[in-house]
A protein has these predicted regions:
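NAD(P)H dinucleotide-binding glycine-rich loop of Rossmann-like/cofactor-binding domains
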Residues: 13-76
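C-terminal hydrophobic helical "lid"/dimerization subdomain
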Residues: 201-253
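Adenosine-nucleotide cofactor-binding segment
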Residues: 90-152, 200-202
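Glycine-rich phosphate-binding loop and adjacent beta-alpha segment
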Residues: 100-103, 148-219, 253
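A glycine-/small-residue-rich N-terminal strand-loop-strand element
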Residues: 1-19
Length: 253
């Protein structure tokens, strides 16, 4: 611990999110990016949840305030972010619809809080959303897919709904005419990132504490379904790219 650091000491259990360089057994980084881990959060949970869980925290609580009665569409609902988002949104009282790529992933998403699932490879997800909501459509779409789900995601939104693009697993969304948002119902569209939401120390701590609270209470469980040795990092990436994983993937030194 460097000179001038007053809120951390040698032996404290800490976690962080943001600074690159995590594929290592030891590293050096600024103390203001570290947060203390509560005793009821394991290292494995922390590794599997800090980036994904903090992302879900701001998506559901700040980008769009999800609450009782909100109708939410989560793309890739069986992925690392998706499983946390489904649980947390359900906990907040929302109706959760998730798109998935297989029946096994549909079952997994439902076990983790999704009320309805859509097999996007076999079904028209826009038509299914209209059917599930009896034409009311969704208040917000959380999209980490990108190119493959746009602009169809806009057709899942009610007038004045929110399209939240937080990732681009299938590629970047192409440039589009902003008037499309007006034509689809005076929609809002945003491309948020965790770095901006957690840029201030007080926000980082507040967001972390919110995450620790829902995980510590059991309201949200962190599915670390895939653990790899640090030396096998390349294989973990290949499995991710091959869509062979669900939930969080962690590397163990």
């Amino acid at each position: 611990v460097g000179p001038g650091v007053t809120d951390l000491k040698v032996g404290d259990r800490v976690a962080y999110v943001g600074p690159l360089g995590g594929y290592a057994a030891e590293r050096v980084f600024n103390a203001d990016r570290a947060v203390k881990l509560p005793d009821n959060i394991s290292y494995e949970q922390a590794a599997g949840m800090m980036l994904k869980g903090m992302t879900v925290q701001y998506l559901l609580n700040r980008t769009f305030k999800v609450g009782k009665g909100t109708i939410v569409l989560v793309h890739a609902a069986a992925g690392g972010v998706g499983l946390i988002a489904c649980q947390w949104a359900n906990h907040l009282g929302a109706t959760v619809i998730g798109t998935v790529g297989s029946k096994d992933k549909a079952d997994l998403a439902k076990k983790n809080g999704a009320h309805h699932t859509i097999l996007y490879r076999d079904e028209d997800f826009v038509a299914k959303v209209k059917e599930i909501t009896s034409g009311k459509l969704c208040d917000v779409v959380y999209d980490g897919i990108g190119k493959d789900t746009f602009p169809a995601s806009l057709d899942c939104l009610r007038p004045l709904g929110y399209f939240v693009s937080f990732g681009s697993a299938s590629g970047q969304i192409a440039a589009f005419n902003i008037n499309l948002l007006q034509a689809k119902g005076s929609l809002f569209a945003t491309r948020p990132t965790l770095n901006h939401y957690a840029a201030k120390r007080e926000d980082l701590v507040s967001m972390s504490n919110d995450l620790f609270k829902v995980v510590g209470s059991g309201a949200v469980k962190i599915p670390t379904n895939h653990s790899y040795a640090l030396k096998d990092a390349a294989r973990s990436h290949a499995d991710l790219e091959g869509r062979k994983t669900t939930g969080s993937v962690i590397l163990v030194p």
